[in-house]
Amino acid sequence: MKGGKRTQKAADKNRINEQITGVDEVRLIGTDGEQAGVVSINEALDAAAEAGVDLVEMSPNAEPPVCRLMDYGKFLFEKSKEQKEQKKKQKQIQVKEVKFRPGTDEGDYQVKLRNLRRFLEGGDKTKVTIRFRGREMAHQELGIELLNRVKNDLEEISIVESFPRRAEGRQMIMVLAPNKK
């Protein structure tokens, strides 16, 4: 679809100056934030021109619509700056995966446990996957034991979000989330 973004942005924008049509009166707010009361649209446009600022429609659905005298360019700049700041503050939570086998030896287990601990302390969720091959499917209890061992080793820094009752296909998956500090 061509031009989809433009139409979406047009809906976000406030109407300014001569774009405000279809109304006779507006509730006017001055540059200092004080209410000037209900005035005709022409008086509001004259006041904006006199002050050297724009007449910006803040809430078009109100009766009468609320308009404010302000520098629209500065308003847009502040708004985009605020949105960027909020986006920076949001932390993207990732799900990291560590794979085990039912016969994982002690050395490998400790390395994988260290990685899990590092991911959880970094604030990421972790997915612990136990993969079964061939005849290992007959010994699913080994997978459950391994998941319980991981759960117990990490219980002071994590909470279990989901724990498998049985194997899904040829694997068991447990999801751990970091403790809230």
Swiss-Prot record:
Keyword Amino-acid biosynthesis annotated: no
UniProt KW Cytoplasm keyword: yes
Keywords: Cytoplasm, Initiation factor, Protein biosynthesis
Pfam family, one: IF3_C
Coiled coil (residue ranges): none
Domain of life where this protein originates: Bacteria
Gene Ontology biological-process annotations: ribosome disassembly
An example Gene Ontology molecular-function term: ribosome binding
UniProt cross-references to InterPro entries, sorted A to Z: T_IF-3_C_sf (IPR036788), T_IF-3_N_sf (IPR036787), Translation_initiation_fac3_CS (IPR019813), Translation_initiation_fac_3 (IPR001288), Translation_initiation_fac_3_C (IPR019815), Translation_initiation_fac_3_N (IPR019814)
Record's GO cellular component terms: cytosol; membrane
Annotated localization: Cytoplasm
Family, similarity comment: Belongs to the IF-3 family.
Assembly information from the UniProt record: Monomer.
Its job: IF-3 binds to the 30S ribosomal subunit and shifts the equilibrium between 70S ribosomes and their 50S and 30S subunits in favor of the free subunits, thus enhancing the availability of 30S subunits on which protein synthesis initiation begins.
UniProt name for this protein: Translation initiation factor IF-3
Species assigned in the record: Idiomarina loihiensis (strain ATCC BAA-735 / DSM 15497 / L2-TR)
Gene name, Swiss-Prot/TrEMBL: infC
